[in-house]
UniProtKB/Swiss-Prot annotation:
Gene: rpl22
Listed name of the protein: Large ribosomal subunit protein uL22c
Pfam family, one: Ribosomal_L22
Job of this protein: This protein binds specifically to 23S rRNA.
Stated family: Belongs to the universal ribosomal protein uL22 family.
Disulfide bonds: none
Organism: Staurastrum punctulatum (Green alga)
Keywords, ordered alphabetically: Chloroplast, Plastid, Ribonucleoprotein, Ribosomal protein, RNA-binding, rRNA-binding
Subunit structure: Part of the 50S ribosomal subunit.
């Protein structure tokens, strides 16, 4: 058995690491979700929670769940405080599209597209909080 000597490799810095959470197959149009995530990108965790709770859009709830999950991942996996987190990146990608048919007159059927999306949230420690 060969053992590698990793003594001169420094451990990764916790302040530079990003933690992510992904919500897949959210039954909502990516265009509608992008309207909301543009408002929270770059904000602190607590400020993003306040914004998401009081915005009148249906897309806020799955985004709120994903942001809370990313903060819980950062707290559990890296031991970062939720109060010092900022949302570094938020992305929305198109997911699979469910295709259905609506019955119409004279035996016709018109297609219906039911889009879904994937929401990815990255959080990291606030840079000004690192100098302790």
């Amino acid at each position: 058995m060969i053992e590698k000597n990793n003594s001169n490799v420094s451990p990764p810095r916790r302040d530079l690491q990003e933690v992510r959470a992904i919500a897949k197959r959210v039954r909502m149009s990516p265009h509608k979700v992008r309207k909301v995530i543009d408002q929270i990108r770059g904000r602190s965790y607590e400020e993003a929670l306040m914004l998401l709770e009081f915005m009148p859009y249906r897309a806020c709830y799955p985004i709120l769940q994903t942001v809370c999950s990313a903060a819980a991942n950062a707290n559990h996996n890296l031991g970062l405080s939720k109060a010092n987190l900022i949302i570094s990146k938020v992305m929305v990608d198109q997911g699979p599209v469910l295709k259905r048919f609506r019955p119409r007159a004279q035996g016709r059927g018109y297609p219906i597209r039911k889009p879904s999306c994937t929401i990815t949230v990255f959080v990291k420690n606030h840079p000004s909080q690192n100098e302790n």
